[in-house]
């Protein structure tokens, strides 16, 4: 059994159907696993869509027949966006939907050894969305400083096209993209620890308004401090956080999978801990 986040199931359904629609180019074992998983993933996705529609019926505006009222576009035609009675109703709908999407489903999925399909070049997101189908990764525990965690996170986001402003999703060998996404999840846990500590330090040293919100400098997003000593103490302790060691689980991938990939040399240097000969 595999635990799969509900939001991933929705994306996986789309990617599996795209894979099956152009299956002649894909490895046979990958196509076979996708075909075996299609019905199961589709059923789960349909259940999630039904739940979303039910939530809309509870929180969005409806007509006398119970149909959901859509917002009107500038051209006078209804859009895909539902209309809500208030901002509070919209917020509650989004919170409830976020809760169900963050839950996980236990599914008995068909898997395939990553080394048998890893060279197949596909959209980078497939490495994340279809990750539950892949087995056989070698993993390794690594100790990274906080600064290295941030640099590694930034490098992976650049390679996978996760940065804002990227117009076209990159295509990468499946083993490479999946290894990066798996490691990214572990890095995110360490990054959360760093951010939580940073906010604690801001709460301790920065200026705050009556509601306890940290004040920022004029025309800036930088925190405002009551005096130089407080700002110095903040940066000193923050540097300690960045120099602390954090355990990360790296999914290893052979350096050969970067052949033909448009990747800056500095990313290879930063991500050396997950690359092997």
For the regions a protein language model found, what residue spans apply to each?
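A composition-driven surface/loop motif
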Residues: 1-277
């Amino acid at each position: 059994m595999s635990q799969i986040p509900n939001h991933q199931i929705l994306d996986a359904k789309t990617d599996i159907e795209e894979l099956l629609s152009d299956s002649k180019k894909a490895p046979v074992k990958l196509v076979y696993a996708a075909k075996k998983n299609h019905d199961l993933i589709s059923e789960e996705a349909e259940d999630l869509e039904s739940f979303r529609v039910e939530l809309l019926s509870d929180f969005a505006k409806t007509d006398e027949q119970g149909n959901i009222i859509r917002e009107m576009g500038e051209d006078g035609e209804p859009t895909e966006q539902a209309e809500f009675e208030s901002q509070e109703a919209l917020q509650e709908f989004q919170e409830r939907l976020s809760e169900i999407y963050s839950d996980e489903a236990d599914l008995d999925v068909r898997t395939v050894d990553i080394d048998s399909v890893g060279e197949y070049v596909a959209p980078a997101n497939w490495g994340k969305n279809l990750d539950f189908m892949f087995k056989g990764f070698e993993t390794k525990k690594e100790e990274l400083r906080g600064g290295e965690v941030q640099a590694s996170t930034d490098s992976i986001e650049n390679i996978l096209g996760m940065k804002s402003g990227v117009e076209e999703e990159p295509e990468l060998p499946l083993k490479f993209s999946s290894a990066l996404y798996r490691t990214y999840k572990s890095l995110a846990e360490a990054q959360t620890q760093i951010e939580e500590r940073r906010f604690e330090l801001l709460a301790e040293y920065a200026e705050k308004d009556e509601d306890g919100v940290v004040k920022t400098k004029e025309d800036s997003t930088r925190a405002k401090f009551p005096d130089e000593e407080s700002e110095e103490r903040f940066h000193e302790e923050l540097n300690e956080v960045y120099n602390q060691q954090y355990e990360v689980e790296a999914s290893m991938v052979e350096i050969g999978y970067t052949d033909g990939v448009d990747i800056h040399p500095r990313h290879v240097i930063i991500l050396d801990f997950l690359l092997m000969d």
